[in-house]
Amino acid sequence: YRLTSGQNHDGLYVGYGLTQIELQGQGQNALSLNANGKVGAAAELSSRLTGSGDLALDSQKGHTVSLSGLNNDYTGLTDLRSGNLLMLNDNVLGHTAGLQMAEETVLDMNGHSQTIGQLTSAAGSVLNINGGSLTISNGGTSAGALVGSGNLNIDNGVFSVKGSNASLSATTAIASGAEVTLDNVQGLGTGKIIADGHLNLNAVEGHLSNNLSGKGEVSFSESNVALKGDNSGFSGQLSLDKNTQLVASAAEHLGEATIHNQGDMILNSMDDWTMQNQVDGSGNIIKQGQGTVTLTANSTYTGTTDIQQGGLMLGQEDAPVTLASQQVNISSAGMLSGAGTVLGSIHNAGLFVAGNGASGHFTVGGDLTNQGAISLGNIGQSAGNQLIVEGNYHGSNGHINFDTVLGDDRSATDKLIVKGDTTGNTQVSVTNAGGQGSQTLEGIELIHVDGRSDGDFAQSGRITAGAYDYSLVRGQGANNNHWYLTSQLIKPENPEKPVSPTEHMLRPEGGTYTANHAAVNTMFNMQLHDRSGKAQYTDVSTGEMKTIGMWMRQAGSHQSWYDGSSQLRTQSNRYVMQLGSDIAQGSTNGHDSWRLGIMAGYGHDNNQTRSSATGYTSRGSVNGYSTGLYATWFADNTDHKGLYFDGWAQYGWFDNHVKGEGLASESYKSKGLTASVETGYTFKVGEFSGSKGTVNEWYVQPQAQVTWMEVKSDDHREANGTRIEMNGNGNIQTRLGARAYLKSFNKMDEGKGREFQPFIEANWLHNTRSFSTKMDDVSVSQEGARNLGEIKLGVEGQITPDLNLWGNVGVQMGDNGYNNSAATLGLKYHF
């Protein structure tokens, strides 16, 4: 068993049936095995190999030596000088101190396990784990190819892997105290890496797709690497030197690792994900991609945070996060949000959402420059967030949005608190967070400045709640440094009517809703003469008085009025077309007459309300239709004298629109009944003859009318949350008046059925209710219309035996600047 081989001996044949060989020679004196031209058993050494000597394998290229000894325990080197080596059992290389592989050599582990000391493989060699398990206990250098599946265990020492091993799918385990260095991102192939020791990637570039686990360290030097594997099981440390860029695009890429960053850590993702890792060092974090990354751990890194695209969120209201970054830059496509603290300064050119709960706080330890948009909390969801700037605030034409429960001085609100100075220009908008509007005294403080308050904060857009408009103003006296929201009228803007400076600013929409509601209740109202002109006509061929016919009238009007505060002036223009037809007529005694008819109508009303307090305007419109019945009775159907009664009832339906300046458009519907009863008495007061044979008869007709208006508008909630309730329907309007008209007939028209009736009419109208709108708890009403005086001038004429025309103009005057001018043109065709 003590056979040896050396330079002066012929050697041992591999196929000798020896049971044990003790290796004593080393280097050039090592036992050398070759299997040139041999296969099967002839190329297999099954003897036990023991001793401290080396084992050399020297077959020609492509020829294979197989080792199958079960109890090999030699401790020398294994030198694969040429050819191939095939393992047929576990640990056939004994306790070899090292495995050396020359160029073009191949080791096939063939599914078996082997522990070696050091591995040294030359470029061009191939170590195929092939489902086996290779343990390296003393590091080494692998310049050849590592291929196959199985396990590669680095127990100790420094193991340097050169180049790419894309065909290696084995799991690599780096034990605590061991180190593996790579110069290619695929140095350990595609298999899992259990890094309880140190994995060092030096000057590598590309995607690291291996799944990492363990508690050790993975370091990157002079590298540009994108993590692509599932590293959820890695809880060690990722280290970046100052010349390294490391990209992560999902939470599993970083696992539970702490990150020591001296370079650039790039968070790039199209999706949202949460980063629980702590980051230290003096390197930078760069956010790219449209997704949002939420940081849930405090980080002590002091480098720059550059949000180039997408969002970076710091914690939540109940779990704020501190970021020690000395400079945070938010680009135009970037967003910073959350609750917590940035110890450094922030330059915002994108979107900065400070606070994300009911009362979140965000603190900026340095200065804040706002060139983009800042939102305190999520817009419209809650009020009570605070943005605290320990340094100075500079507005570079940026914008801030506050959520405020718009009410009185005690209202909950978001707030900007600046411990230093303010400079520059900033636009401010406010979103109502459920407030119903109220009267303020000093106002609701939005911006508090401890230092010099040289910055200008200008209101952007309207701020409305309930019936009130709010304005952003600088405080007075000792509060001059701060900025407030107030519903109080500070300075009227050239008011058309004097307004008390202690009043509060009403929204013009209140006037518009009221104008719409008044329009739907009055649009189709009429009196007898509006509908039918001359009450009856004479058939010249028979001399009979007749009243059956089809009629149409068109009316237009312009109305102007103020609300009770005199801040709101409303003007409206209306067009109405109605048509109808008598469908039946008769007489009860041969002297009187009655008729029954149907009618329908279309109307349109446009109105505008302007606030003299704020200059804001609101526009409204109504489109509606009606259908109804009418009935008329005349006591005397022959000589135009005596008593008459007239009544009508209509059902109307309407589409309403309101558009406030800078506010969302609002739409709602109205529908309901209107009805009227009218009576009058016509008597002749005189007669005189004019020149050229004209006969003139003078008549007076006292009139009384009661009109009931019950068109209801739907209760409505505006987009800003204001509840709208319109009142005044149920109004009963009474009209008392008299018409004086002249019936003229010229002998030239005898036999032509032509006559004219110029008239003048005066009325007093009384309304039991005023039309108004309740906006949350504040009412805006139409003033001046409770008692109205009316004058009408017009003419009614029978043009031909079959055609009547009439027209008139009139004006109604009331208190508080109320006026309504109207014109009517009608025709009736008899058949």
What are these language model-derived features?
Residues 628, 710, 719-831:
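Outer membrane beta-barrel transmembrane domains
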Residues 349, 401, 549-553, 595-599, ...:
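Residue-level detector of the transmembrane beta-barrel scaffold of outer-membrane proteins
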Residues 542-546, 585-590, 635-639, 683-687, ...:
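Outer-membrane beta-barrel strand-turn architecture
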Residues 1-42, 46, 401-404, 412-413, ...:
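Outer-membrane translocation/initiation segment of Type V secreted surface proteins
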